[in-house]
A protein has these predicted regions:
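Nuclease catalytic cores that cleave nucleic-acid phosphodiester bonds
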Residues: 86, 91-249
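Domain-level signal for Mg2+-assisted phosphodiester chemistry and nucleotide/NA-binding surfaces
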Residues: 1-128, 144, 188-202
Length: 249
């Protein structure tokens, strides 16, 4: 395992020239949580700011209007030094009311289950799931709320605009979503360096490796910019747990 100093040196070797960082926080947080760790925003900003050649660290995350915790987190991000790009989170009501459908119908379940998995479910499994939903309905629960706030368009637009206006050499993108294949290829074709920070990328991005796309495994930064989710304690400083998770509930 490399020391923090060695990791910093490694980052410097990857992020060459004038660099802009684009953090899709919802995407990063979801991936980190699956590995039982969380991003410490203090240490993230401090780490990349210390490299000397990072001129912008852009943080994309939705805000729940009127929610003190959400609005406070955004204020904190700005105070730390991030360039925060946000918009209101949309709360979508998804029906779980199975009262009007056959017990073996997947019409409600398919809203929450990927098609590839849905096709594998047996009739018995679907009936059991609908049975659980019916119990929820009987207790008065007819819908669930899902928060939605996607920044793919904003991030892609900012990357291309920064390329035109700010002569950026290296683009550090913290998301591995397929929607970025087009913008990334455009930057690569203009001889720019693009590095995706993620522990997994879409096949569309993986196909761009021969064109010059590089992928940095974000798990390697866990000890440098993270803290353990299950303990709620920073790997380096206890104060990090106050700001890292941003549970906007």
């Amino acid at each position: 395992m490399r020391t923090p100093t060695e990791r910093i040196d490694e980052l410097r070797s990857w992020l060459d020239g004038k660099t802009h960082v684009y953090i899709d926080y919802a995407n990063v947080r979801a991936k980190c949580e699956k590995k039982d760790w969380m991003l410490d925003v203090y240490k993230t900003w401090r780490t990349f700011n210390s490299l000397g050649n990072v001129s912008a660290i852009k943080f994309y995350f939705g805000k729940i209007l009127g929610n003190r915790k959400s609005e406070g987190f955004h204020a904190l991000l700005r105070k730390i030094g991030f360039e925060v790009i946000t918009k209101p989170v949309k709360l979508m009501k998804l029906s779980i009311d199975v009262s009007g459908i056959p017990k073996d119908s997947p019409s409600i379940i398919k809203t929450f289950v990927e098609p590839c998995l849905l096709r594998k479910l047996t009739v018995e499994a679907i009936e059991n799931l609908n049975g659980e939903l019916r119990k929820m309905n009987n207790s008065g629960l007819k819908y669930v709320e899902m928060m939605k706030c996607n920044f793919d368009v904003e991030i892609a637009a900012d990357m291309l605009l920064d390329n035109e206006l700010h002569a950026v050499d290296t683009f550090c993108l913290w998301t591995g979503d397929s929607d970025f294949a087009g913008p990334i290829l455009r930057l690569l074709n203009e001889k720019k360096r693009v590095i995706v920070f993620s522990d997994g990328i879409a096949p569309e991005l993986d196909d761009l490796r021969p064109d010059g796309l590089r992928v940095y495994d974000i798990k390697k930064l866990k000890d440098l910019i993270g803290y353990e989710k299950q303990k709620g304690l920073s790997l380096e400083s206890p104060s990090a747990k106050i700001v890292g998770s941003c549970d906007q509930s």
